[in-house]
Amino acid sequence: DFKDEEFGINEMRNFVLKHEKSKLVFSVTFSYPANMTLETIVETIREKAKNMEVTCVQHYFPVKFEKDCPMVSLLSKAYEKITHLDGTPVTTTGGTYAKLMPHIVPFGPSFPGQKGIGHQPNEWMKIEDLNTNAKIYALGIYYLGML
């Protein structure tokens, strides 16, 4: 049971089970909180799956920025200026694109009532919210340009 107060719980998704060269291969994608290590997760899986070979094929470290770092503060400021809502940053175990390049803050504003709509089948967003996001991104880029 891996969890972190800020990031939430470890997520497992993209399950694939296939037969390969007389072996049954089970693949899964994990997104895990920054307070965990890959080694801890792999060891836990090995303990639970004693008769199976466990291999990490690809790994990206979790992304974590302090809430008061300049980039996060400016993006929060842009959110608050456009929405007039509390822009206190929250985090998840996602942010895949930010794991591929250093110094990229994963930023995707969400609005009240939108919990859990991202990365789901038939992902959706209201046109009004899409327009609000565009305004937030534009102002955020403007603010970041002042760093």
Predicted regions and their residues:
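Short amphipathic alpha-helices in soluble, non-transmembrane regions
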Residues: 39-50
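An extended, acidic, His-containing surface patch that forms the Zn2+-binding/catalytic region
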Residues: 1-13, 18, 35, 53-147
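C-terminal catalytic subdomain
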Residues: 23-38
